[in-house]
């Protein structure tokens, strides 16, 4: 059975008379390894050899080979005062001490760069970034130079060219800046339209720097466009129902305050009605199918060229209603495209005001006034200054009036006695 060798070879300690070849042979046969314990039991254990156990390393070389290693190593006279490390050269010690103190004397000389390094080779490697024109970080360094020049001269946002997608601004020379994190106000303002009246083209001053809309602002603007588009479709049936009046059109436009800022680059007044809806229609046709704005017209367009109060053809999106708001069932206006200039004197452009016959529709007629008698009227009696003269005369009804069925009198009026009593009561009350 093979014996498991331990980390410390005790057979070499117990048998110092063996040759060095046997000491270095670790791949002995099983017979030699089993014979070693028998020799250890026969020979006495010297006490001097047991004292050398503490000088041996577990996996290191043998004690005979350790005497030659210190002679080959160079002396390390430069020791670190803060730790136990020693170095062969002075510059190695100086570089090591800077790891404890944090000193970085090697600063980058490139304008606009505030990087500092504790080693000169790190500075040399960093300088290649600025010297290489194809490097991404070199392009960032050039943009860092442009930003201070733009802010110092005070150029307007409309005059500046659009920057790169991820331009960073260098930090002050006394502070360290990270190249992967850019401050929120380091972007140069970018104009969505060439006009200066765009609400997003104005500059914002924060900590003495001008900034424009960043990624979060673009996201909020896109969300606002979607909400305005939803509100536009919500108010569209209500607007189309009152589409024939200019007041309803302006009211519906006031209900959509956000569409005017996103669809048009110049401001519109409330009187500029045609231009507003014309640009909204053109913008809706340019939109993509997946965009919040639909390709249908945002509102029915009005034709101011025609003198008619109603258009000749109502849009398909509007509800079906009669052009003339009158209860005549058979009245229809002729379409304008069928009329010519030569027939304008013979054929009227519009139908007559009252073309309906009496048989088609009859308005509720008021009862005809009663035939006035030759006596004084009721207003003349009431207007008399003397109160004693304010007396109603007894009504006198002729026989022909009582017999006629279509005279216009109510049945209660035909009774002369009841009318007389009513007249007497009225005189007493006056």
From Swiss-Prot:
InterPro entries from the UniProt entry: creA/MIG_C2H2-ZnF (IPR051007), Znf_C2H2_sf (IPR036236), Znf_C2H2_type (IPR013087)
This protein's name: DNA-binding protein cre-1
GO terms (BP aspect): regulation of DNA-templated transcription
Compositional bias of kind Low complexity: 30-46, 289-303
Ranges of compositional bias, category Polar residues: 1-19, 130-147, 175-187, 412-422
Biased composition (Basic and acidic residues): 97-106, 268-277
GO molecular function: RNA polymerase II cis-regulatory region sequence-specific DNA binding; zinc ion binding
Compartment list: Nucleus
Purpose: Involved in carbon catabolite repression. Represses the transcription of a number of genes by binding to a GC-rich region in their promoter.
Residue ranges, annotated region (Disordered): 1-77, 97-187, 265-340, 357-430
Pfam families found in the cross-reference section: zf-C2H2
ZnF segments: C2H2-type: 78-100, 106-130
Gene: cre-1
A GO cellular component entry from the record: cytoplasm
Main location: nucleus
Keywords attached to this entry: DNA-binding, Metal-binding, Nucleus, Repeat, Repressor, Transcription, Transcription regulation, Zinc, Zinc-finger
Sequence similarity: Belongs to the creA/MIG C2H2-type zinc-finger protein family.
């Amino acid at each position: 059975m093979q014996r498991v060798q331990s980390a410390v070879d005790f057979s070499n300690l117990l048998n110092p008379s063996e040759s060095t070849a046997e000491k270095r042979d670790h791949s002995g046969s099983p017979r030699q390894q089993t014979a070693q314990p028998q020799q250890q039991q026969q020979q006495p254990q010297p006490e001097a050899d047991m004292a050398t156990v503490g000088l041996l390393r577990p996996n290191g070389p043998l004690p005979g080979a350790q005497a030659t290693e210190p002679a080959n190593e160079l002396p390390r006279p430069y020791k670190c005062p803060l730790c136990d490390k020693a170095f062969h050269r002075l510059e190695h010690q100086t570089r090591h001490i800077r790891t404890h103190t944090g000193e970085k004397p090697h600063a980058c000389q490139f304008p606009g760069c505030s990087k500092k390094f504790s080693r000169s080779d790190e500075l040399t490697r960093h300088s290649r970034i600025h010297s290489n024109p194809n490097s991404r970080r070199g392009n960032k360094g050039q943009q860092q130079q442009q930003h201070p020049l733009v802010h110092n001269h005070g150029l307007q946002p409309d005059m500046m060219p659009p920057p790169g997608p991820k331009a960073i601004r260098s930090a002050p020379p006394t502070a360290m800046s990270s190249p992967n994190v850019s401050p929120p106000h380091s972007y140069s303002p970018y104009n969505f339209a060439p006009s200066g009246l765009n609400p997003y083209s104005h500059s914002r001053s924060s900590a003495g720097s001008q900034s424009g809309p960043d990624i979060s602002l673009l996201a909020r603007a896109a969300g606002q466009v979607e909400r305005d588009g939803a509100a536009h479709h919500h108010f569209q049936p209500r607007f189309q129902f009152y589409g024939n009046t200019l007041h309803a059109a302006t009211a519906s436009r006031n209900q959509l305050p956000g569409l005017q800022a996103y669809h048009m680059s110049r401001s519109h007044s409330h009187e500029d009605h045609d231009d507003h809806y014309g640009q909204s229609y053109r913008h809706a046709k340019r939109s993509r199918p997946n965009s919040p704005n639909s390709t249908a017209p945002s509102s029915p367009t009005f034709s101011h060229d025609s003198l008619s109060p109603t258009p000749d053809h109502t849009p398909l999106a509007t509800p079906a209603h009669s052009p003339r708001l009158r209860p005549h069932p058979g009245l229809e206006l002729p379409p304008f495209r069928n009329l010519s200039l030569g027939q304008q004197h013979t054929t009227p452009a519009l139908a007559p005001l009252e073309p309906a016959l009496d048989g088609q529709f009859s308005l509720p007629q008021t009862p005809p006034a009663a035939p006035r008698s030759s006596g004084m009227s009721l207003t003349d009696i009431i207007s008399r200054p003397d109160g004693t003269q304010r007396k109603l005369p007894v009504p006198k009804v002729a026989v022909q009036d009582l017999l006629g069925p279509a005279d216009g009198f109510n049945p209660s009026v035909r009774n002369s006695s009841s009318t007389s009593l009513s007249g007497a009561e009225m005189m007493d009350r006056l």
